[in-house]
């Protein structure tokens, strides 16, 4: 499918990157970026609709909430049209009622994690903290989220390498929480206003780092689910549409977990060479300690 799309629309930026293997195509987008032209995604819809009656119809994985993988009524369709942008939004709207082999792979609601709207609200609250009292409710939300990660530990144990990443993330998160509580304790013993303001900034920075770690581990749950599906269906033609950050992490893990060849392309069909083996952002500093060997 990728070759046909690039040939038809070589200069239309509908997606950011694509990962290809023999029977896997993974498309990465910038979430909620308004499409200037839906031609690429229209082509994808046409391609899949031609395949929907085939015995070997491709499986379509969309980064859409697993608990919201269908429309209950016409009002839901109308509301969905009004809210959201991007290729995944377009594909879900056009295919969910007609294409039989769709799986929604964003399990974050199902696992009890924060919604994207809740994450943005929490991030904004942290950014606008002006007193130490405002730190506590934000910390409590992140502490509860950390407990939820622990409750869901079995979810991450399906593949050893993926589980090791989960454990290192949890370890670093716990260290961050311990450090944050220590900083709050130090703040309580400060007497001068100037020193308190300086320490409050340090507390905010530590709280924000904890937020990023929680957000990244929540996002990682999507990677785990997609990778599990790909590994358990080695002979099935599968198209994946997800955020670009998911694409890079999935690409990284598939290369070290399988002996299959995967190539990374940009939206112009040019091969992209990855010079770093770092699958996570700067906030996950323990990645080097993980033994990725099988």
Question: What does each of the following model-derived ranges do?
Answer:
Residues 1-294:
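Compositional signal for N-terminal targeting/processing segments
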């Amino acid at each position: 499918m990728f070759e046909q799309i690039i040939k038809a629309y070589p200069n239309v930026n509908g997606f950011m990157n694509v990962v290809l293997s023999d029977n896997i195509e993974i498309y990465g987008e910038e979430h909620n970026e308004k499409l200037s032209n839906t031609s690429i995604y229209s082509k994808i819809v046409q391609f899949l609709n031609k395949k929907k009656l085939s015995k070997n119809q491709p499986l379509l994985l969309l980064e859409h909430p697993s608990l919201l993988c269908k429309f209950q009524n016409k009002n839901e369709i109308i509301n969905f049209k009004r809210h959201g942008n991007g290729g995944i939004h377009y594909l879900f709207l056009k295919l969910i009622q007609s294409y039989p082999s769709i799986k929604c792979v964003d399990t974050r609601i199902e696992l009890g994690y924060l919604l994207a709207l809740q994450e943005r609200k929490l991030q904004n609250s942290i950014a606008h903290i002006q007193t130490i009292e405002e730190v506590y409710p934000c910390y409590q939300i992140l502490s509860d989220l950390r407990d939820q990660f622990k409750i869901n530990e079995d979810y991450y144990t399906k593949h050893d390498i993926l589980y090791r990443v989960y454990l290192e993330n949890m370890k670093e998160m716990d260290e961050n929480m311990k450090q944050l509580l220590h900083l709050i304790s130090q703040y309580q013993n400060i007497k001068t206003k100037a020193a308190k303001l300086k320490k409050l900034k340090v507390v905010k920075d530590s709280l924000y780092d904890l937020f990023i770690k929680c957000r990244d581990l929540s996002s990682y749950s999507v990677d785990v689910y997609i990778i599990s599906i790909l590994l358990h269906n080695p002979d099935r033609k599968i198209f994946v549409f997800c955020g670009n950050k998911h694409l890079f992490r999935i690409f990284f893990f598939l290369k070290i977990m399988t002996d299959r060849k995967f190539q990374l392309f940009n939206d112009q069909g040019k091969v992209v060479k990855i010079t770093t083996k770092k699958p996570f952002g700067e906030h996950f500093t323990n990645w080097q300690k993980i033994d990725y060997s099988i």
